[in-house]
């Protein structure tokens, strides 16, 4: 039976450590500050943004949300970002995705100054991360997965890591991190056009799935002893839940848990790590500001 990789508990420990670092910065006259820009009133986005600002405040950081109307123009949004870029009390800027269709999300993300891009999506940070520059802000989900593997003493050196999915937000930066000197993993990336997906997933010592499709990975697709990291977030109807739904991952958890050596649950696995690494990146941004 696989041990459960508890992202909630790992996050709790990390946040306690970070709270001490925040207090030390405050003693030096710097309070880390994160500003989140939310366009529109999507309930899921509102809830996610609220959880981010609450997490900031729980550590003694400043967390603020700027809510703009659904029909905000690109120019007006850029003006808000310009103001935040110029504000020395704001160390991290995050524009909550998804954006309305009329806003060019790539241009929006690139308008954030790289030194405040705590989501790690700016091309400058992507390039710095690719070459292993410590100044880079690494996207929060890949960074959280790496931290989870490290803290759970799961070795990656010489291991075959198979990633299902090829997104710029998770899979590609994660592959780069895993192949870097230190982690030293051999990485295979698969995607929707990969023929015979199971022939690849069965080779994995560590299987990371980030697609967004319920039960994509079944028990016959993994080998005994595999470590499974499930990044998927899928909403399924559940009349027994007060909300009328529950969240599940991309992996058939109940079927694979008896086979694997370790596995992340959904919820409570990778998700908490993502928000915690956003806090870590904001703390890093404040430190880098102090050093300049």
From Swiss-Prot:
Catalytic activity entry: (6R)-5,10-methylene-5,6,7,8-tetrahydrofolate + NADP(+) = (6R)-5,10-methenyltetrahydrofolate + NADPH; (6R)-5,10-methenyltetrahydrofolate + H2O = (6R)-10-formyltetrahydrofolate + H(+)
UniProt: NADP(+) binding residues: 165-167
EC number: 1.5.1.5, 3.5.4.9
A Pfam family hit: THF_DHG_CYH_C
Source domain of life: Bacteria
Tagged with keyword Nucleotide-binding: no
GO biological process, alphabetically ordered: L-histidine biosynthetic process; methionine biosynthetic process; purine nucleotide biosynthetic process; tetrahydrofolate interconversion
Pathway named in the protein's UniProt entry: One-carbon metabolism; tetrahydrofolate interconversion
Keywords, comma-separated and alphabetical: Amino-acid biosynthesis, Histidine biosynthesis, Hydrolase, Methionine biosynthesis, Multifunctional enzyme, NADP, One-carbon metabolism, Oxidoreductase, Purine biosynthesis
GO cellular component: cytosol
InterPro entries assigned: Aminoacid_DH-like_N_sf (IPR046346), NAD(P)-bd_dom_sf (IPR036291), THF_DH/CycHdrlase (IPR000672), THF_DH/CycHdrlase_cat_dom (IPR020630), THF_DH/CycHdrlase_CS (IPR020867), THF_DH/CycHdrlase_NAD-bd_dom (IPR020631)
Record GO terms (molecular function): methenyltetrahydrofolate cyclohydrolase activity; methylenetetrahydrofolate dehydrogenase (NADP+) activity
Quaternary structure and partners: Homodimer.
Family assignment from sequence similarity: Belongs to the tetrahydrofolate dehydrogenase/cyclohydrolase family.
Reported function: Catalyzes the oxidation of 5,10-methylenetetrahydrofolate to 5,10-methenyltetrahydrofolate and then the hydrolysis of 5,10-methenyltetrahydrofolate to 10-formyltetrahydrofolate.
Protein name: Bifunctional protein FolD 1
Organism: Myxococcus xanthus (strain DK1622)
């Amino acid at each position: 039976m696989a041990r459960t990789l508890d992202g909630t508990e790992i996050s709790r420990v990390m946040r306690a450590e970070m709270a001490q670092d925040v207090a030390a910065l405050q003693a030096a006259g710097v309070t880390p500050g994160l500003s989140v820009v939310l366009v529109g009133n999507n309930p899921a986005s509102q809830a996610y943004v609220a959880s981010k600002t609450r997490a900031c405040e729980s550590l003694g950081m400043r967390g603020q949300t700027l809510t703009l109307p659904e029909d905000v123009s690109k120019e007006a949004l850029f003006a808000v970002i310009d103001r935040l870029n110029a504000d020395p009390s704001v160390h991290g800027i995050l524009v909550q995705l998804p954006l309305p269709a009329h806003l060019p999300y790539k241009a929006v993300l690139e308008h954030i100054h790289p030194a405040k891009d705590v989501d790690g999506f700016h091309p400058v940070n992507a390039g710095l991360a690719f070459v292993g520059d410590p100044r880079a802000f690494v996207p929060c989900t890949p960074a959280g997965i790496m931290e989870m593997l490290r803290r759970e003493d799961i070795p990656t050196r010489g291991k075959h890591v198979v990633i299902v999915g090829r997104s710029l937000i998770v899979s590609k930066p994660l592959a780069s991190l895993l192949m870097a000197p230190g982690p030293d993993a051999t990485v295979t990336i698969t995607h929707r056009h990969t023929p015979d997906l199971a022939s690849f997933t069965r080779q994995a010592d560590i299987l990371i799935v980030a697609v967004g499709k319920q039960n994509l990975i079944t028990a016959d697709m993994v080998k005994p002893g595999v470590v499974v990291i499930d990044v998927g977030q899928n909403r399924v109807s559940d009349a027994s839940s007060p909300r009328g739904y529950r969240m599940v991952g991309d992996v058939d958890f109940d079927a694979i848990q008896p086979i694997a050596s370790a596995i992340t649950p959904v919820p409570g696995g990778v998700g908490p790590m993502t928000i915690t690494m956003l806090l870590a990146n904001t703390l890093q941004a404040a430190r880098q500001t102090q050093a300049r």
